[in-house]
Amino acid sequence: MSRKNEFISIALLASPLILASVAPALASSGGSLPWEGPLEQIQESITGPVAGYIALAAVAIAGGMLIFGGELNDFARRLMYVVLVAGILLGATTIVGLFGATGASIGLTNDRATSTRPSAEGEGAHG
């Protein structure tokens, strides 16, 4: 048997053992990442009720300045547009929450899934 064939056969025999010993190390999870905590706090601050009130006040004040502000210079007008858009973006999550949308819902839950069994209520009760 040549040296090359011997090396290939040893490698083929050893590879399942090596892969089996590495699998637990690859499957372990390190927990959460260090930046997830602060990002979750920012997200909770932006989507809370206080942020909704701040967004409403920002939209009202910026809109009032743009409508009744008279002669604003270009910088002040652009600043009011930025405040107006920021208020709308902060308030958008609150507005979506008012309509009952809390997150993605893919598929039906078990209690809402249609059943193939006849129902004992309503028109399904034949007897």
UniProtKB/Swiss-Prot annotation:
Q: Where in the cell is it found?
A: Cell membrane
Principal subcellular localisation of the protein: membrane
Please report the record's description of how this protein sits within the membrane.
Multi-pass membrane protein
One Gene Ontology CC term in the entry = plasma membrane
Q: Name the source's superkingdom.
A: Bacteria
List where the protein spans the membrane.
7-27, 50-70, 79-99
The UniProt keyword set, sorted, is: Cell membrane, Conjugation, Membrane, Plasmid, Transmembrane, Transmembrane helix
Q: Which InterPro entries match?
A: TrbC/VirB2 (IPR007039)
Tell me the protein's name.
Probable conjugal transfer protein TrbC
Species the sequence originates in: Sinorhizobium fredii (strain NBRC 101917 / NGR234)
What gene name is listed for this protein? trbC
